[in-house]
Each structure stands twice: as structure tokens, then as C-alpha cells.
From Swiss-Prot:
Transmembrane segments: none annotated. It is found in: Periplasmic flagellum; Periplasm. Keywords: Bacterial flagellum, Periplasm. This is Flagellar filament core protein flaB1. Belongs to the bacterial flagellin family. The flagellum consists of an outer layer composed of two sheath proteins, flaA1 (44 kDa) and flaA2 (35 kDa) around a core that contains three proteins flaB1 (37 kDa), flaB2 (34 kDa) and flaB3 (32 kDa). It comes from Brachyspira hyodysenteriae. Component of the core of the flagella.
């Protein structure tokens, strides 16, 4: 379960990064 939580957190960080890039565009 801890691993799943870590993966979800990493995915959230990735989505935030992609959103920031889109905003920059």
C-alpha cells in the first residue's frame, strides 16, 4: 500500500510539472 501511495504522489508531481509547462506555453 505504501508503494501505491508513492506512485500516486509521483504521478501527481508529474501532472503538476506538465500543467506548469502548458501554462508557460
Amino acid at each position: 500500500m505504501v508503494i501505491n501511495n508513492n506512485i500516486s504522489a509521483i504521478n501527481a508531481q508529474r501532472t503538476l510539472k506538465f500543467r506548469q509547462v502548458d501554462l508557460k506555453k
